[in-house]
């Protein structure tokens, strides 16, 4: 069976983690301005840089942005959207997304992460390993939540927010748009 082709934007650390999950389902290629065309990373070829997206669109219809910088991820996502790319979600086999949760486009849900019943996650959100988004919690577009952090029931994480590792966003708490929450922080 032939796999669909998928462009992975970013071949850095996070991009490689995304690639490990994506290659289970897709025929992947990297786009990265810092790598030479033809280079292989994790067995995946680099086919160009961001300037090549218009020409790559002729061959690829799917794209996921694996860049940790929220602002840059948003810029690339919007540029690719304008070019007509579609954005599948990459969900690790050990992750759980409730059928009663809402998840946007182009999200990455890494191993052992959970998005529970009634939760909502915006577009191009990165949920690292062990992250939990509890019932009725909301995560805005382009947010990044690092390893083992928990967004509790009814809490809200704003767009472009960055939540460090091992954080707890307590029940009904709000993290504002663009906030940067350090590792091991509890937000009440």
Language-model-detected regions and their locations in the chain:
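Hydrophobic, well-ordered beta-alpha structural blocks that scaffold small-molecule cofactor pockets
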Residues: 1-57, 160
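Short alpha-helical
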Residues: 13, 71-72, 102
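Short amphipathic alpha-helical segments
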Residues: 19-22, 75-79, 121
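Structural motif
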Residues: 28-29, 64, 106, 124
């Amino acid at each position: 069976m032939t796999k669909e082709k998928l462009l992975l934007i970013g071949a850095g650390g996070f991009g490689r983690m995304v690639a490990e999950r994506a290659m289970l389902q897709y025929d992947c290629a990297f786009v990265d301005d810092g790598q030479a065309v033809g280079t292989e990373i994790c067995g995946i070829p680099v086919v160009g840089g961001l300037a090549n997206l218009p020409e790559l669109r002729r061959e690829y219809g799917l794209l996921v942005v694996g860049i940790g910088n929220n602002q840059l991820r948003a810029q690339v996502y919007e540029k690719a959207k304008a070019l007509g790319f579609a954005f599948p979600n990459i969900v690790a086999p050990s992750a759980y997304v409730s059928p009663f949760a809402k998840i946007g486009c182009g999200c990455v849900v890494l191993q052992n992460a959970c998005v529970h019943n009634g939760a909502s996650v915006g577009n191009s959100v990165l949920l690292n390993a062990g992250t939990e988004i509890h019932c009725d919690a909301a995560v805005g577009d382009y947010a990044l939540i690092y390893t083992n952090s928990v967004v509790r029931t009814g809490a809200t994480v704003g767009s472009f927010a960055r939540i460090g590792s091992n954080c707890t966003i307590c029940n009904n708490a709000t993290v504002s748009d663009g906030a940067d929450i350090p590792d091991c922080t509890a937000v009440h």
